Curated annotation (Swiss-Prot):
Keywords: Calcium, Heme, Hydrogen peroxide, Iron, Metal-binding, Oxidoreductase, Peroxidase, Secreted. Heme binds at H30. Binds 1 heme b (iron(II)-protoporphyrin IX) group per subunit. Binds 2 calcium ions per subunit. GO terms for molecular function: heme binding; lactoperoxidase activity; metal ion binding. This is Suberization-associated anionic peroxidase 1. It is found in: Secreted. It comes from Capsicum annuum (Capsicum pepper). Its EC number is 1.11.1.7. Removal of H(2)O(2), oxidation of toxic reductants, biosynthesis and degradation of lignin, suberization, auxin catabolism, response to environmental stresses such as wounding, pathogen attack and oxidative stress. These functions might be dependent on each isozyme/isoform in each plant tissue. It comes from the Eukaryota. It is an enzyme of class 1 (oxidoreductase).
Amino acid sequence: GFEVIAQAKLGGQTYTVALGREMVALAGAHTVGFARMGNLPPSAGAQLEIR
């Protein structure tokens, strides 16, 4: 299989996260809204809870 990688900006910092997981764990981060971009599937536009 493969993982879809996307970048999320939060507090001026850019995080690189792998989509397709129920949650992406980033320390001290809040909910991030991913903008749809390039070849990412519609699910990439969904918000992921970061906790």
